[in-house]
Structure formats: structure tokens, C-alpha cells
């Protein structure tokens, strides 16, 4: 089965190049980031359980830090106050349109902010807040982000196209991550791999290599974590059959909270098996 077949089909259907499509500005643009988050909270209601009421604020990264920080991030609040819930946007990334929309979904609803307050509402043992479950946390945010591509403009395939592109990029970076830190690829081997995929600019190849070398297994948290949630959802669908409800599935996953994926799978599958 060709994993990029849907991606190629959309390209043929629209009769456009990938570059032209991704640079298109025909998608709606939101100027108010807090309004985007409010819109997302309404859009997720059919697919995700209700989130506890909370306050949040969208802020900009200080100009002195823009070149050194991520395009966006959610600042996890102290466990004893659960506030403030701040999402920071880096203006240096110059995000807008679909990119900004899906980024706020990743960091806000139904991503990090939503998952954090939902887990806290279950009154977990405090020690669980100390356990760094990066695969669950970043995997959930990436999985949740994928829904925003459909919410953004549901009447077209634009969102599906963009998500496939995002997924392929994460896959490529994850393969490089594994190649470098597990198989021992050097910069020349990575350059060959990237060239085979059409990335031939040596400066870009070097930059990608350096980013991955400095942060081992980072991309795996996002991409493999997301795939774990997608696989778990598929297995739950097969067990539940026509009785499967996506909202209930997400409720089970959120109630269990951040943990190792074998633990999560056992708990979720057991609930469907019984």
C-alpha cells in the first residue's frame, strides 16, 4: 500500500504543484488568535469531551528571544494553581492562515492546554506530574492538531492535503532522527538521504542535520506518538464496530492520562473488550 497515494491523488485532482498549493493564500485568515481558540473550542465538541472551564492568554515571545525559541509553545502551569495557561507565539515564524490555526490547535484546543487541564481535572496522584511522558504529550498534541486541518475548511480537500504534507515532513525528520542517533548516520549519509527526496541545497541539508543532532529523538515524540494514537483509535474502532464513538474514545484516553503507550493501550483496549 502506497502511503503517499492520497497525497498524490489530491495533487492530480487539483492539477497544481505542491509548492503552489502550500503557498496559496485562498484559505481564510484569522487575525485574532484568541478568537481562533474560541472557534476551536466549539468545533471540537462533537469529537472531544467537554473541557473544564479555564482561563488562558495568548502572548508573543519577547523580541530578544525570537531567534532562539520555537515558533510556538504552551507554558505548562504549576500543578498547585493550574494557572496561568499561556500560549506563546513567535512572530519571527511569521505564521498566518492555516499554519497559525493548526499551531493554536496543537498548543491549545484540543492539544496541550486542553489535555493538561483535562488530566488535572481527574485529580491524579501528584507524582504523575513529575513523570516526563513526552511521547504521550507531544503525540497527543500532534494527533489533536490533525483534526484542525479538517475543521479549518471542511468543504474542501485543502486541509487534508496540508495534513498529509505535515505528516510526510514529520516522517522524514523521524527517519533522519533514527538514522543519526540509532544507525549512526553522518552528515554525508543524511545529505544523500535528503537528496533522494529532492532536498539538494547543501546549506539546508546541513541545517537539518544540525537541528536533529542537537536534540535526539525529539521528532519521534511527535510523529511516532501521533501514530500510536492513530493505531489505538483504529484498534478501538475494530473492537467496538458500529458502536464506536470517537468522543468516548478520546474521553478514555484523556482519563488515563500521560503514560507509556503499552500501559495506555492495555487500559483502553481492556475497556472495549469488556
Listing of model-derived features with the role each one plays in the protein:
Residues 1-274:
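N-terminal maturation segment of proteins
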Amino acid at each position: 500500500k502506497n502511503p503517499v497515494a492520497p497525497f498524490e491523488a489530491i495533487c492530480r485532482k487539483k492539477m497544481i504543484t505542491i509548492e503552489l498549493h502550500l503557498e496559496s493564500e485562498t484559505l481564510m485568515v484569522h487575525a485574532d488568535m484568541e478568537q481562533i481558540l474560541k472557534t476551536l473550542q466549539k468545533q471540537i465538541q462533537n469529537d472531544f469531551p467537554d473541557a473544564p472551564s479555564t482561563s488562558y492568554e495568548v502572548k508573543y515571545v519577547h523580541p530578544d528571544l525570537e531567534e532562539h525559541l520555537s515558533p510556538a509553545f504552551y507554558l505548562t502551569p504549576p500543578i498547585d494553581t493550574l494557572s496561568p495557561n499561556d500560549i506563546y507565539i513567535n512572530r519571527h515564524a511569521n505564521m498566518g492562515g492555516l499554519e497559525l490555526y493548526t499551531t493554536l490547535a496543537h498548543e491549545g484546543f484540543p492539544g496541550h492546554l486542553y489535555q493538561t487541564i483535562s488530566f488535572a481535572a481527574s485529580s491524579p496522584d501528584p507524582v504523575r506530574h513529575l513523570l516526563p511522558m513526552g511521547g504521550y504529550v507531544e503525540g497527543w498534541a500532534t494527533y489533536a492538531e490533525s483534526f484542525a486541518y479538517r475543521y479549518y475548511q471542511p468543504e474542501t480537500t485543502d486541509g487534508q492535503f496540508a495534513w498529509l504534507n505535515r505528516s510526510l515532513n514529520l516522517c522524514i525528520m523521524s527517519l533522519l532522527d533514527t538514522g543519526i542517533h540509532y544507525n549512526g548516520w553522518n552528515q554525508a549519509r543524511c545529505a544523500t538521504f535528503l537528496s533522494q527526496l529532492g532536498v539538494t541545497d547543501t546549506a539546508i541539508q546541513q541545517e537539518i542535520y544540525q537541528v536533529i543532532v542537537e536534540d535526539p529523538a525529539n521528532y519521534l515524540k511527535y510523529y511516532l506518538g501521533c501514530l500510536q494514537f492513530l493505531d489505538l483509535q483504529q484498534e478501538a474502532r475494530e473492537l467496538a464496530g458500529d458502536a464506536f464513538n470517537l468522543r468516548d474514545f478520546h474521553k478514555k484516553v484523556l482519563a488515563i492520562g500521560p503514560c507509556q503507550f503499552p500501559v495506555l493501550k492495555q487500559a483502553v483496549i481492556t475497556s472495549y473488550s469488556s
